[in-house]
């Protein structure tokens, strides 16, 4: 099992993540109702195990959670400032973050052994996926060497100010990826104030969303952009079956 934390890293080549020609398309599933966190993790882990065993195809699962906080493998209890919502300890890399309505979570279950067994290149590919997705809305986002996630410069707030618009936290088991990304579309940003998001306490670095930046988008718009950008980086997708994961 491999976890990816927020330790400093070099920007790595994210290309060559597409599978070999003739590989099955990645299933693309969207849940319309909020999914409880324990249920989502159990479902994701079962599917990842089936992928590793060659019994299921790869999957991207888009969903929202009810309001909650998660602590990754580098999380610290002191980063929870207020106990507003349930806190779940999880196996992904990273520290504390908030999930809730208005945030698009994408759980990505890919067989990196078939694609490219390079965990840091995979994280860079996830960053590029987010950057390409938000570029469809004319939002210029950037990655940072010392801060995992995707950031937007905020000169309106002051020199050197940046806000995180999307978070990344992954885990690999038998080279199958678990967890994934979270893009802030229209969440209640005040809930991030109850934690030290991703362990970053510097006041120059905050949190934003598409709507906070003045874009009148809805979740469906983001889902369409996510799928198009994903296919350019990771390969073809197909709609998942109506029932089951």
UniProtKB/Swiss-Prot annotation:
Classification via Pfam families: LplA-B_cat (PF21948)
Residues that coordinate or bind substrate: 92-99, 167-169, 180-182
Q: Which reaction does it catalyse?
A: octanoyl-[ACP] + L-lysyl-[protein] = N(6)-octanoyl-L-lysyl-[protein] + holo-[ACP] + H(+)
Write down the position(s) of the site called Lowers pKa of active site Cys.
164
Q: Which GO terms describe its biological process?
A: protein modification process
Could you tell me which PROSITE patterns the record lists for this protein?
BPL_LPL_CATALYTIC (PS51733), LIPB (PS01313)
The positions flagged as active site in the entry are 198
Q: Mainly localized where? A: cytoplasm
Tell me which NCBIfam families the record gives. Answer: lipB (TIGR00214), PRK14341.1 (NF010921), PRK14345.1 (NF010925)
Protein's name according to its UniProt entry: Octanoyltransferase
Q: What gene is this protein a product of?
A: lipB
């Amino acid at each position: 099992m491999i976890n990816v934390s927020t330790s400093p890293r070099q920007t790595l080549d994210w290309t060559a993540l597409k599978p070999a020609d003739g590989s099955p398309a990645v299933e693309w599933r969207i849940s319309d109702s909020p999914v409880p966190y324990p249920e989502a993790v159990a479902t994701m882990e079962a599917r990842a195990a089936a992928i590793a065993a060659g019994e299921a195809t790869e999957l991207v699962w888009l969903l929202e959670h009810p309001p909650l906080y998660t602590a990754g493998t580098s999380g610290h209890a002191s980063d929870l400032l207020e106990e507003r919502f349930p806190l779940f300890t999880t196996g992904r890399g990273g520290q504390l973050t908030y999930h809730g309505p208005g945030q698009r979570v994408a759980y990505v279950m890919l067989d990196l052994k078939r694609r490219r067994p390079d965990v840091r290149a995979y994280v860079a590919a996830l960053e590029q996926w987010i950057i390409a997705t938000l570029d469809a809305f004319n939002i210029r986002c950037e990655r940072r060497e010392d801060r995992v996630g995707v950031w937007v410069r905020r000169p309106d707030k002051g020199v050197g100010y940046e806000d995180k618009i999307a978070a990344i936290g992954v885990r690999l088991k038998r080279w199958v990826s678990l967890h994934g990304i979270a893009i802030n579309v229209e969440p209640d940003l005040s809930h991030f104030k109850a934690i030290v998001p991703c362990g970053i306490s510097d006041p120059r670095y905050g949190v934003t969303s598409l709507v906070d930046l003045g874009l009148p988008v809805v979740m469906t718009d983001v889902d369409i952009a996510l799928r198009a950008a994903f296919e350019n980086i990771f390969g073809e997708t197909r709609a998942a079956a109506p029932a089951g994961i």
